[in-house]
């Protein structure tokens, strides 16, 4: 579960390395985000010469979450870290590569570009 002030790693090559959640989209009192949910983040660490810089505020989608999520077939999916992919204003990924596996739930949420760029879909 991702909430405000949660630190996350970035799973793309947009230039950001670490981000912090500052807002969870999806309702007035919504507190937690899970895999496939959009959040607002601020960049805490970035590589020099990247697309995004430190202190930038942008939207992101959660692609890996440490809290387990139950699937319809009864199985659970859980990752070792909380990771996001940064999005532009149109909802497309800002980077051109995705690092690490992503969850199958992104396909249901219509993030086909992220699913196609990912090296592995679990």
Curated annotation (Swiss-Prot):
Keywords recorded for this protein, A-Z: Ribonucleoprotein, Ribosomal protein, RNA-binding, rRNA-binding
InterPro entries linked: Ribosomal_uL14, Ribosomal_uL14_bac-type, Ribosomal_uL14_CS, Ribosomal_uL14_sf
Signal peptide from the UniProt entry: none
One term under GO cellular component: cytosolic large ribosomal subunit
Keyword RNA-binding in record: yes
UniProt keyword rRNA-binding, yes or no: yes
Superkingdom field: Bacteria
GO BP term (any one): translation
GO molecular function, one term: large ribosomal subunit rRNA binding
SUPFAM superfamilies linked: Ribosomal protein L14
Segments passing through the bilayer: none
Family to which the UniProt record says this protein belongs: Belongs to the universal ribosomal protein uL14 family.
HAMAP family for the chain: Ribosomal_uL14 (MF_01367)
Functional summary from the UniProt entry: Binds to 23S rRNA. Forms part of two intersubunit bridges in the 70S ribosome.
Subunit note: Part of the 50S ribosomal subunit. Forms a cluster with proteins L3 and L19. In the 70S ribosome, L14 and L19 interact and together make contacts with the 16S rRNA in bridges B5 and B8.
Descriptive protein name: Large ribosomal subunit protein uL14
């Amino acid at each position: 579960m991702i909430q405000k002030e949660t630190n996350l790693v970035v799973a793309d090559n947009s230039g950001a390395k670490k981000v912090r959640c500052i807002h969870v989209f999806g309702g007035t009192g919504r507190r937690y985000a899970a895999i496939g949910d959009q959040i607002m983040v601020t960049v805490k660490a970035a590589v020099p010469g990247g697309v995004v810089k430190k202190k930038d505020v942008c939207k992101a989608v959660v692609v890996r979450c440490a809290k387990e999520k139950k699937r319809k077939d009864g199985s659970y999916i859980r990752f070792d870290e909380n990771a996001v992919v940064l999005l532009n204003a149109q909802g497309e990924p800002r980077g051109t590569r995705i690092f690490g596996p992503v969850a199958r739930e992104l396909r249901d949420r219509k993030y086909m570009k992220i699913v196609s760029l990912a090296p592995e879909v679990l």
